[in-house]
Amino acid sequence: MAVKIRLRRMGAKKAPFYRIVVADSRSPRDGRFIEEIGYYDPLKKPAVINVNAERALDWLKKGAQLSDTAKALLTKAGVLKKTAGEGQ
């Protein structure tokens, strides 16, 4: 089972809110997921990114792949800097 960390769109029309989830890569964007590890609200100024870093790092160690957007958000939240520091 290929697992990805990606965004799941929530909210109303023209008012998106995203949950950062771990899901099987074959499931639809807003479909079934394994675990919710955070959220992203782009409408707030500044945009709010809240991620459970411990769970995200745990899934990355298990081999989960990041979508491009999830990678950018985790980098901005400082989660991926923690993985780079662990390798040293």
Swiss-Prot record:
Keywords, sorted A to Z:
Ribonucleoprotein, Ribosomal protein
Enumerate the PANTHER family for this protein.
Answer: 30S RIBOSOMAL PROTEIN S16 (PTHR12919), SMALL RIBOSOMAL SUBUNIT PROTEIN BS16M (PTHR12919:SF20)
* Gene3D superfamilies (alphabetical): 3.30.1320.10
Xref: Pfam families? Ribosomal_S16
**What is the gene name?**
rpsP
Can the keyword Glycoprotein be found in this entry's annotation?
no
One GO MF annotation is:
structural constituent of ribosome
Parts forming coiled coils? none
Listed under GO biological process in this entry are:
translation
Which NCBIfam families does the UniProt record give?
A: S16
Q: What is this protein called?
A: Small ribosomal subunit protein bS16
| Similarity-based family | Belongs to the bacterial ribosomal protein bS16 family.
GO CC, any one term: small ribosomal subunit
